[in-house]
Amino acid sequence: MKTVILLLVLALTVAIIIPTINGESVATAISDSEAEPLAESFAEPLALLSKDQALKHVWGVLKKLGKAAMEYVIQQICAKYNKK
């Protein structure tokens, strides 16, 4: 479990410290097919939710964004070292 947490922290650190890899922004890691559902999920009127529900909703969206960014960073690192 500690290893998984360390790997996640490392991936997030790389995504934050190195905003681009091979000239491509990490922000572009989220494809259009992933971005559209995320945008729709934010369209839900958060004002009608309780504070706890709104926080859970926003946290869920942030987790999806973080996962996509981490997957992209890992793919780029693997691609870089598999080119040999």
From Swiss-Prot:
Keywords associated with the record: Antimicrobial, Disulfide bond, Secreted, Signal
Cellular component GO terms held in the UniProt record: extracellular region
Propeptide: 24-47
Entry comment describing in which tissues the protein is expressed: Expressed by the venom gland.
Compartments reported by the entry: Secreted
Signal peptide feature range: 1-23
Keyword Signal: yes
Coiled-coil stretches: none
The organism's place on the tree of life at top rank: Eukaryota
Intrachain disulfide bonds: none
Similarity section: Belongs to the formicidae venom precursor-01 superfamily.
Subunit record text: Homodimer; disulfide-linked.
Annotated function: Causes cytolysis of mouse DRG neurons, proved by a drop in calcium concentration in all cells and a corresponding increase in fluorescence of the extracellular medium after toxin addition. May be one of the major contributors to the pain associated with envenomation. May have antimicrobial properties, like most ant linear peptides.
Name of this chain's protein: U-myrmeciitoxin(01)-Mg2a
